[in-house]
């Protein structure tokens, strides 16, 4: 039984939302970030980059405290207002290609995370969790929701569709030509019905935001120990999430680029590859795999198709069946000598939206020696990994929608 609940969001006033909403800090180039901070005093980037006010880079506890100060200033200056009644928020994003993502912004339970009702498919890094726990404890809010997915539900879809027939509280288009819509929903009977629908769902799945959700859970445990009157219903026992149906989730692959062939000649490398894959040289013809366990490779001016020789590789669980794991186990580790795909500087990743033409250019310019492409992970594969308690290799999925910060804020 999944528990979600409505909350009183702090959010921008209607005339400011398009100016406040910001992509994740790291998604901007230095030049883009500088331009937005210089030209837009309402950007949420001012909150998360408080040192800009003094032309200083501020880090650690000092930064966290100043983030809190900037946030309070936005509230004091009337940029933000707080909802008077707990709401669910129907949220819709239509990207520049016309693809729509529609779901519900709500507070999800850290206890559900602990009980594996909310399931994970990625490993988290302890040092990142420690940093983010300190950050959350100081600032006291979530500004970017964790992306969760749930099985398609006709009743829930009907409720959402009905709400979207009314005028949206927010409707704005970004410079990326993505259009955002938000409907606060406070009607008690409908709110209760939504909560009951989720209570009947045995599991939810994290699509994006593993570090944010794990850090929220760790913080809840810490604050519970500090609170002698802890009831498990305090706001810190929840984290902001955006829940979308599985059919709306879009998963793209990450292609791989490798700096060198680990001292092997092209011919020596291909011979070693031949033991595990059937290899076909496709010359200059772009090749994108059409089946699982088929791979595209670009090397020395030629595209190759690689087909796994099934008698050379044993598949006993969902992880072993993943194409990213097959590349690691049969090529990267034994042939190219890459044992740590997270930290080895010889490997780089490019999301599948850039396609194999991007990979070709990176190899042709001699920045990399070889590139690999594959089909994206499916939602069912992602769920199976989570259900079996396994974790995907790093950079196995590039997931949309990518969410903006500052549209709704959850305080705890």
Regions found by a protein language model. Give the residues of each.
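Surface-exposed, charge/polar-rich loops and edge strands
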Residues: 1-412
